[in-house]
From Swiss-Prot:
Primary location group: cytoplasm
Name of the protein described by the UniProt record: Chaperone protein HtpG
Similarity annotation: Belongs to the heat shock protein 90 family.
Cross-referenced Gene3D superfamilies: 3.30.230.80, 3.40.50.11260, Heat shock protein 90, C-terminal domain, Histidine kinase-like ATPase, C-terminal domain
PANTHER family: HEAT SHOCK PROTEIN 90 FAMILY MEMBER
This protein's record includes keyword Metal-binding: no
Region feature (B): 342-558
Record-level Gene Ontology MF annotations: ATP binding; ATP hydrolysis activity; ATP-dependent protein folding chaperone; unfolded protein binding
UniProtKB keywords: ATP-binding, Chaperone, Cytoplasm, Nucleotide-binding, Stress response
Amino acid sequence: MTQNATSETLGFQAEVKQLLHLMIHSLYSNKEIFLRELVSNASDACDKLRFEAIDQPELLAGDSELAIRVSYDKAARTITIADNGIGLSREEAIANLGTIARSGTREFFSQLTGDKQKDAQLIGQFGVGFYSSFIVADRVSVLSRRAGSDEAIRWESDGQGEFSIASAEKATRGTDVVLHLRADEDEFLNGWKLREVLRRYSDHISLPILMRKEEWDADKDEQVTRDEWETVNQANALWTRSKSEISDEQYREFYKTVSHGFDEPLAWTHNRVEGRSEYTQLLYVPRQAPFDLWDRDARRGVKLYVKRVFIMDDAEQLLPAYLRFVRGVIDSADLPLNVSREILQESRDVRAIREGSAKRILSLLEDLAENRKDDYAVFWGEFGQVLKEGVGEDPSNQERIAKLLRFASTHAGDASQTTSLQDYLGRLKEGQDKIYYVTADSYSAASNSPHLEIFRKKGIEVLLLWDRVDEWMLSHLREFEGKSLVSVAKGGLDLADLADEEEKKKQTEVAESFKPLIERLQTALGEQVKEVRVTLRLVDSPACVVVGQNDLSPHLLRMLKAAGQEVPEVKPVLEINPEHALIARIRDVSDADFGAWAQLLLDQALLAEGAQIADPAAFVKRLNALLLKV
């Protein structure tokens, strides 16, 4: 670092250097977004000034007409984006223009692949903002003066690793960003081109975006710039317009502004709500999940305005957590202009907005599920696990959310999660009054579970679940439309409804005839198991393990252990298949080998369940010894 009384040269934060390099190489095909980002920043600066001026009206003194001015100089090869907003202090310039102060930075960089198209999407999700200047500029200068201060600063950088910051003179508050264009970026030194980009990307900005008028000079045979300024955008907030006045393309472009991305939204809803709370909402469901969807500290929520005055960017209190992927704007007519995050947590109006917005998004998803099934499949693949959280978090909408859930199923025969609970009910067997499911660590483990054998034999559908959130969700979703949801891995599973009279009679007889073997197995396995018993739920497997009806499932126990949680000891119940050849073999084994066979039976049942056995080396040694005797 070098410095004197008024200037210093500092190094960019390492992550900024990396982002600049990636951005210049990955976003070049989307280079026009630099203008969108800089105009958006200028608009935000004006919004922040308007907000601070609520308590300090003197900040607007002498210059209350907020606007953004875009100009270019062909001779100097520069583009300038100027605003009369809040401005930057020296400390703010260093913090905002030299570092990335947000969570999820490390996770963002870890997900980059080297594929320009995929990385461009990730960079868009992360938010490039000011740094997009360097896509088209080889040097950027920022002249800024904070509202309420007489001191100004000049920030400069070539984007190569360092930036300088020095004291400067500026007659008015606000910020001027000057881009010194690269040699091959002459297309932006054109008034028509700049207007076209501004109208495409920033027409919805509520502030006027001004450019100098241009006229054709016949004598000079060229366009000439006049001193008079003209507004090039509509200069009213998109969400305040009537839906009939807004094209789908305008909705899509506005989404790209609020999401800072390049992808198209999957769907949106735009409504004006009147009643106990009056507000306008324009909410979007993205097509792709953000890289930090599971980061607890990630920025989430929608932009909050009050009477068209910007209040905050990430008002997460306006939507329930399970809809944290939603982007957009909510403009309230009832909240106070000086609203804080603390007030948001306690406000009755906010609760009304949150409940109303949740219902709107659920209606939007219901429409997708019913009328745009391919789009809903995309949504489910990206956000299905998050939506499942709503089953427990939003009891008032639980039934609606349950109808939106999608599962893999033995009916489909593959891992695609396309079966709804209503689909399942439509395929119930005669006399079936339960919805059966199995949970596991993966689709493969679920679809190959021995617990499915009797259900496959009888043609009864079973839902296959392996997402980490599933066990928690199922603890809140006990029934659907009067039918209980039942795990096929629970020992208390009542299979009587699935058996005919002959099978019930056979089950009673078998249980009696196998009592001696059951007692031998119980003695040999001792405290390792809660119980040993005969079952008719198995067809191809010799044995399986189950847990009590009120015990935690093996799958949930494994997840809790992996998370470092203390878990209660749950002894499994070993169930044996009386018709399997291995069980017949074990009945005749001598006492000398019986203990080894009993342990092998339990270990392979645990492995089939996806559990870890206590001593893998002993298992292999025992298996090899018994194989030599076969």
